[in-house]
């Protein structure tokens, strides 16, 4: 039986909310949810993982925040791809910018376990 883990609408980003220890607590909540998702994948071992867009909350952000959000996405996609081949689809332009997805394409260039579709 083919098992597919389908996920999307991660909306990685900083949202208005409290800061704890200088960190946006909403961003930390998103990271904890992504960590749970990866643990679920590691436990249930799907044959294929599909990430269907809206990975990022905002398409246009300042460089330091944008780099942190892109690094979070890359690290999480890499963790998922260690479980099963992973297909990443670009979402709506107001969330997933062309530049963000070019960074994902570059990050996973030559990695046969990840396909980024723009």
Predicted regions and their residues:
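A secondary-structure boundary/capping signal
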Residues: 6-8, 52
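Short polar catalytic/cofactor-binding loops
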Residues: 8-14
């Amino acid at each position: 039986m083919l098992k597919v883990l389908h996920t999307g609408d991660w909306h990685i980003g900083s949202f208005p909310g409290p800061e704890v220890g200088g960190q946006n607590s909403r961003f930390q909540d998103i990271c904890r949810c992504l960590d749970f998702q990866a643990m679920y994948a590691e436990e249930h071992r799907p044959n294929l993982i599909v990430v269907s867009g809206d990975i990022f909350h905002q398409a246009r952000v300042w460089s330091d925040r944008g780099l942190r959000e892109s690094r979070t996405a890359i690290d999480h996609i890499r963790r998922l791809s260690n479980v099963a081949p992973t297909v990443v689809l670009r979402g709506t332009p107001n969330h997933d910018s062309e530049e963000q997805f070019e960074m994902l394409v570059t990050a996973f260039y030559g990695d046969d376990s990840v396909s980024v579709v723009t």
